[in-house]
Amino acid sequence: MIAEIPENYVSEASLRIQFYRKFAQADQIEDLLDLNREMLDRFGNPPPGFIAFTEMHKIRCLAQSKEFISIESKGEKLMCRKKRSQSDPYLKIGNRFPRLTNREPLIKLEEIFNYIESYHLKA
């Protein structure tokens, strides 16, 4: 599955580019939810590729607010690199990377979002 604004969802190229720009500039999840509502109102029910696209942007916004500089999944491993770290720059449970339990892309993105959401910054 490709995370995108598909041509069969928003057929006009200039509109797609405009929405790509709006999503890239959004830095709060509330802004993304507003954009999602606008897309739903204008274009109807979104295809899976667009849902993945919006979920990835939600993860990006949340990760920035939790001071992560990168989020990557390799197989079942979730690798979250912290902005400030005294020792290990990666978030781990014990000495291991968190494990993702689902292989279905949209559920996996939801799992990543929920994991990052549960992370608490240390002062």
Model-flagged regions — what are they?
Residues 1-123:
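Accessory helical-bundle/CTD segments and flexible terminal tails appended to RecA-like ATPase motors
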